[in-house]
């Protein structure tokens, strides 16, 4: 006898299929050392994958380019990994002007995937040892912070102004309470359910739910930022409010030598691929600013 599947079971199965597909998609942002190095090798580039220990966590980063040039460190958003920046890392224009670095933020990629670090300050302190090492080789350092990477870049500049000479903020999640929360994030907050979701999404959700508190704690640091800033965001950003966040940045960055705000018509939150050329252009401009 044929039985109808109860609606809640059907919806559960459908949800699981969707989540599995999302998980498969997200894994393209987390590639092994071998796969990452192969990507660059096929382009005739000699990249390096390295690890260091910070606060008991092994942190992975990639580097490529000439030590005699200035440096750019790319800090990704959520959910993601350093592999989201592969195209930028392989860009011939950027490599002509700088040695390029990209990091797996704590909780992502191969920096303890699934083990969340929701504190912006702790993430900043875990990245600082890499910047200290970069500073030994490079006189100038520009940091690119995309989405959730934006406030981490700001916190690093507040904690260690000697380690950053310029910042590019891409669709930065910096204004408390000005981010979108999606329905799918709610079940990921339930301990018994979170284990069925991709670890990358769970970490992103943990960060999201702590973000307002963390951004409020960051508020006193903004006035201490004294490096040039380039701010880029899409006018159709569906995650970070494009109407209020640029004004927040302008009001808080009161002591920077320069602040350029670029709003892109018809552009949504995700910038790294669709705005590749603009990011390259503005990173090169920032390098010239800080020379």
Language-model features and meaning:
Residues 236-240, 269-270:
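Acidic catalytic loop of the alpha/beta-hydrolase fold
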Residues 267-276:
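Catalytic histidine-centered segment of alpha/beta-hydrolase-like enzymes
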Residues 124-139:
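Conserved acidic catalytic loop of the alpha/beta-hydrolase fold
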Residues 78-90:
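The serine-hydrolase catalytic nucleophile loop
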Residues 225, 231-233, 237:
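Short beta-strand/loop motif that positions the catalytic acidic residue
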Residues 87, 227, 241-251, 276:
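Short alpha-helix in the alpha/beta-hydrolase fold that links the catalytic acid
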Residues 151-154, 158, 167-194:
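Flexible "cap/lid" loop of the alpha/beta hydrolase fold
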Residues 94-112:
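Conserved alpha/beta-hydrolase
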């Amino acid at each position: 006898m044929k039985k109808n599947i109860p609606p809640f079971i059907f919806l559960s199965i459908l949800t699981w299929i969707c989540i599995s597909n999302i998980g498969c998609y997200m894994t393209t942002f987390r590639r092994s050392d071998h796969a990452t190095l192969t990507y660059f090798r096929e382009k005739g580039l000699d990249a390096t994958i390295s690890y260091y220990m910070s606060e008991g966590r092994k942190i992975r980063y990639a580097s490529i380019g000439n030590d005699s040039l200035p440096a750019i460190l790319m800090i990704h958003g959520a959910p993601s990994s350093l592999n989201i920046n592969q195209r930028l890392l392989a860009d011939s224009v950027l490599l002509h002007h700088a040695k390029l670095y990209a990091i797996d933020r704590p909780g992502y990629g191969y920096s303890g995937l699934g083990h969340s670090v929701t504190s912006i300050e702790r993430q900043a302190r875990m990245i600082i040892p890499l910047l200290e090492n970069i500073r030994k080789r490079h006189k100038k350092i520009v940091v690119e912070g995309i989405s959730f990477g934006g406030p981490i870049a700001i916190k690093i500049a507040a904690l260690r102004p000697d380690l950053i000479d310029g910042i590019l903020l891409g669709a930065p999640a910096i204004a408390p309470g000005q981010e979108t929360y999606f329905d799918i994030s709610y079940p990921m907050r339930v301990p018994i359910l979170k284990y069925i979701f991709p670890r990358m999404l769970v970490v992103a959700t943990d960060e999201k739910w702590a973000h307002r508190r963390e951004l409020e704690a960051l508020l006193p640091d903004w006035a201490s930022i004294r490096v040039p800033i380039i701010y880029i965001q899409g006018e159709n950003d569906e995650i970070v409010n494009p109407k209020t966040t640029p004004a927040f940045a302008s009001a808080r960055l009161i002591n920077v030598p320069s602040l350029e705000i670029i709003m892109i018509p018809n552009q949504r939150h995700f910038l790294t691929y669709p705005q590749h050329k603009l990011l390259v252009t503005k990173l090169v401009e920032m390098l010239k600013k800080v020379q």
